[in-house]
Amino acid sequence: ELGDDMDTKLDLAKAYMEMGDDEAAESILKEVLEKGTGEQMVAASELRSRLAS
């Protein structure tokens, strides 16, 4: 299911951020922002704001 797939992508983006691979995380978060549910989009947006800081 697409929602579950986006949850997995959010987890993957967090893992990339922890490893310092912000470029990979940004790419995944962009996809979640395009295809995720409202709740997933909020989570992706919050993670993206952490990348910017």
Q: Which role does the model predict for each range below?
A:
Residues E1-S27, K35-A43, S49-S53:
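Intrinsically disordered, low-complexity acidic segments enriched in Asp/Glu and Pro
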